[in-house]
Swiss-Prot record:
Keyword Magnesium (UniProt): yes
GO cellular component: aminoacyl-tRNA synthetase multienzyme complex; cytosol
Top-level taxon of origin: Archaea
Record note on quaternary structure: Homodimer.
UniProt catalytic activity: tRNA(Asx) + L-aspartate + ATP = L-aspartyl-tRNA(Asx) + AMP + diphosphate
Leader peptide range in chain numbering: none
Job description of the protein: Aspartyl-tRNA synthetase with relaxed tRNA specificity since it is able to aspartylate not only its cognate tRNA(Asp) but also tRNA(Asn). Reaction proceeds in two steps: L-aspartate is first activated by ATP to form Asp-AMP and then transferred to the acceptor end of tRNA(Asp/Asn).
EC class: ligase
UniProt entry keywords in alphabetical sequence: Aminoacyl-tRNA synthetase, ATP-binding, Cytoplasm, Ligase, Magnesium, Metal-binding, Nucleotide-binding, Protein biosynthesis
Manner of cofactor binding, per the entry note: Binds 3 Mg(2+) cations per subunit. The strongest magnesium site (Mg1) is bound to the beta- and gamma-phosphates of ATP and four water molecules complete its coordination sphere.
Binding-site residues, L-aspartate: 166, 210, 356, 360
Gene: aspS
Protein's recorded name: Aspartate--tRNA(Asp/Asn) ligase
Chain intervals for the UniProt region annotation (Aspartate): 188-191
């Protein structure tokens, strides 16, 4: 019976493994075959004069990345991966790989990112790449555990909508019978509707779509968003929830993904310290204007260069708070004593924005006023506004980019590396 490679120790008497031929070295009278499965690598040592002739013939026929089955005796070997080797009694080629390979899974020959993404099924066999997705799996597992333990209800909202939920134009139109429809850019309005339904604490992990013509290392046109909405709290409450979640995720990854962390060479992986600094927008602009190459003034959005300048100053995860109402969405709650400022925030990594959120406007008339101030027609938002007429509780929430979280956590150079099959303005296959 086949066993995972990582369960085989130097003391294991015998084993059957099935995996991919990672490397093959034939030294004449002695051959070495490295077999890889998702749990690790084991060395198969073939002394040709001491094994059956058919085993030596099979070894010669194996091409790299073929799927092979090996049954044999395990022996301690200090120079081999894991301190053990497998001496074969039988070798079978289960599935022969074509040659040449589009890319080198053993990573001895570097490949461009486009080549890797074009051949993602091969690229994902590389231990460093599979480590990324093992950690991403742990991130999403930890996220669901955190929300379940804190009394949240998971929801799944529609990704086909009739209008722009955020009021913008960055939408992908789709053919939907005789109607006009779009791919949803955010579950924002649906989350708020569930506050009117009395769910009080909801979350969703799902795709969002943005028709933005970016071509950068941090933007995608299809991304995974982790969203929450909470009743009877304010922006400060959900900011604390966000900080607690981030630290919980890091702790879970640190505890459960040591092998993947090692595969990525992350010797400095560490859980962020408590108490993410809270930097007012006005102070963030002062930092950026003093050090940024681009001109920036109060009332401007914070672009890439400004993010970089502020991030270098802060040096850790932090919040930018108290944004001008003029540059935040219509549903962000303004301060009662200063309506020009709203209860909105971004959570930032020194490299990029990770999350955006706010306390929401819950009063129907104020929300209509806010929508109109943004130059939008409230009549186009009737399906959204209607719940606010029937007892909407105070509430707040945020959205967190899963890919950006993984990218910054692991120090990846490009957000596409954190997605199995990324979608950007140039890529729709595979």
């Amino acid at each position: 019976m086949r066993v995972p490679i990582n369960t085989i120790t130097p003391d294991t008497p015998s084993a059957e493994v099935i995996g991919w031929a990672h490397e093959i070295r034939d030294l004449g009278g002695l051959a070495f075959l490295l077999i890889r499965d998702r749990t690790g690598i084991i060395q198969v040592t073939v002394p040709k004069k001491k094994v059956a002739p058919e085993i030596a013939e099979t070894i010669r026929a194996i091409s790299r990345e073929s799927v092979v089955r090996v049954t044999g005796t395990v022996k301690p070997e200090g120079k081999a991966p894991g301190g053990r080797e497998l001496i074969p009694d039988a070798i079978e080629i289960v599935s022969l790989s074509a040659t040449p390979l589009p890319l080198d899974v053993a990573e001895k020959v570097p490949a461009e990112l486009d080549t890797r993404l074009d051949n993602r099924f091969l690229d994902a066999r590389r231990p460093r790449v599979s480590a990324i997705f093992k950690i991403r799996n742990a991130v999403q597992h930890a996220t669901r555990n955190f929300f379940f333990e804190n009394g949240f209800i998971e929801i799944n909202t529609s990704k086909i909508v009739a209008a722009a939920t955020e009021g913008g134009t960055e939408l992908f139109p789709i053919a939907y019978f005789e109607k006009e429809a779009f791919l949803n850019q955010s579950p924002q309005l649906y989350k708020q509707m569930m506050m009117a339904a009395g769910f009080e604490k909801v979350y969703e992990i799902g795709p969002i779509f943005r028709a933005e013509e970016h071509n950068t290392t941090k933007h995608l046109n299809e991304a995974t968003s982790i969203d929450i909405e909470v009743s009877f709290t304010d922006h400060l409450g959900v900011m604390q929830t966000l900080e607690d979640l981030i630290r919980d995720i890091y702790q879970f990854v640190d505890k459960t993904c040591s092998d993947a962390i090692a595969d990525l060479g992350l010797d400095d992986f560490a859980v962020p310290e408590k108490g993410f600094p809270r930097l007012p927008y006005s102070e963030a602009i002062e930092i950026a204007s003093a050090t940024c190459e681009e001109d920036i003034a109060y009332g401007d959005d914070i672009g890439t260069a400004a993010e970089r300048a502020i991030g270098e100053e802060m040096g850790r995860l932090y919040f930018i708070v108290d944004w001008p109402s003029s540059i935040r969405p219509y549903y962000a709650m303004p301060y009662e004593n200063d309506p020009e400022i709203c209860k909105a925030f971004d959570m930032m990594h020194p490299r990029m924005e990770l999350s955006s959120g706010a306390q929401r406007v819950h009063q129907h008339d104020l929300l209509v006023e806010q929508i109109a101030k943004k130059g939008l027609n409230p009549e186009n938002f009737e399906f959204y506004l209607n719940p606010f007429r029937f007892g909407m509780p105070p509430h707040a929430g945020w959205g967190l980019g899963a890919e950006r979280l993984v990218t910054t956590m692991l120090g990846l150079p490009n957000v596409r590396e954190a997605v199995l099959f990324p979608r950007d303005r140039h890529r729709v296959v595979p």
